[in-house]
Design a protein with these regions (language model features):
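Flexible, glycine-rich surface segments
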Residues: 158-246, 250
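Conserved small/polar residues in nucleotide/adenosyl-binding loops
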Residues: 289-294
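Bacterial Sec-dependent N-terminal signal peptides
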Residues: 1-22
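N-terminal targeting/trafficking signals and adjacent low-complexity tails
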Residues: 243-273, 277
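Acidic/His-rich structured neighborhood in mature extracellular/periplasmic domains
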Residues: 82-191
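Sec-exported extracytoplasmic/periplasmic mature domains
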Residues: 49, 53-57, 147-151, 262, ...
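Start-of-domain marker
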Residues: 21-82
Length: 294
């Protein structure tokens, strides 16, 4: 009996080592669309879910339990003749070592997502062409999710995924669709990718690694050491802000991390709290108004 079980596990091993990378929850919110057959929105949700979760996106060896938890929420603003105008909220999380806590990595809203989709139309993957703007947008954010996740585990670990995202952006620029072009918007897909690959903001990727591996992951063993590393990362964030105050990385960090930092420093010495607050309020003036209101 034991030999049979072992044989079964050996047969299963190749499939476990080549598991898909993502466990993505997809939602398509059509509440703003009236007088339309809602079935197309459910079909779209199912198609996107299968497209993301059933695909192997890289050569990385990831077991089923290591799949990255993420979500994509498409809010449909307009729908006419198979043309969708949407906002897309992308979120991803990763577990913190030696704890049950998960930390947010991405919490990003794309306000310019438009695509054509006919019900039951297959979503076709391609690395070398734009099959549809929908799959191009999905591909881009999948690669960004993978890049940011791998950056949090190893220094510059996400580079291969940013290179793939760069290919998608280059292809997207040749289309007439919004969101792909430089200088079109400071928070579009082109701006998001550029922030991760430009030399001027390279320090962000290092602080991202320090914050997670040296900071959060360390706190289960030593709260003080882990928190000190997070404080160092915040000081690095200030340098990124000074070099590129309009970078999309600044609101990206805020949307993912500010609530978490309240808990990180809840039991820190007063002097440490004040120092961190002073640094962050210089980057995010909204904190000053929040403090005054409190």
């Amino acid at each position: 009996m034991k030999r049979n079980v072992l044989y079964f596990l050996l047969l299963l091993l190749p499939f476990l080592s080549a598991a898909q990378e993502l466990n993505c929850r997809v939602e398509v919110n059509s509440d703003q669309i009236q007088g339309t057959n809602k079935e197309v929105f459910m079909t779209l949700k199912e198609a996107i879910t299968e497209y993301i979760n059933d695909r192997k996106w890289s050569t990385a060896q990831i077991s089923p339990v290591e799949r990255i938890d993420c979500s994509m929420l498409f809010t449909v603003k307009e729908y006419t003749d198979n043309r969708f105008v949407c906002e897309l909220q992308v979120q991803s999380r990763r577990p913190v070592y030696n704890s049950s806590y998960t930390t947010t990595l991405i919490n990003f809203k794309d306000t310019k997502v438009e695509f054509n989709y006919q019900q039951y139309e297959p979503l076709v993957f391609s690395e070398t062409s734009i099959e549809s703007n929908l799959t191009a947008v999905i591909n881009f954010y999948v690669y960004m999710i993978l890049g940011v996740d791998f950056d949090s585990f190893s220094p510059m670990g996400g580079t291969p995924f940013y290179e793939l995202a760069h290919q998608v952006v280059n292809l997207g620029q040749s289309s007439m669709e919004a969101g792909w072009k430089a200088f079109e918007d400071t928070r579009n897909r082109h701006a998001l990718l550029s922030a991760f690959i430009e030399q001027g903001t390279a320090g962000f990727r290092q602080l991202w690694y320090d914050y997670h591996r040296g900071g959060l992951d360390e706190m289960a063993l030593s709260v003080d050491k882990g928190r000190a590393k997070i404080t160092d990362a915040i000081q690095q964030l200030q340098k990124v802000y000074e070099a590129a105050p309009m970078s999309v990385l600044i609101p990206l960090f805020k949307d993912a991390k500010l609530d978490e930092l309240v808990n990180v420093y809840s039991k820190a010495p007063v002097s440490e709290k004040e120092s961190v607050y002073e640094t962050l309020s210089g980057i995010y003036p909204c904190l000053l108004y929040t403090s005054d209101a409190a």
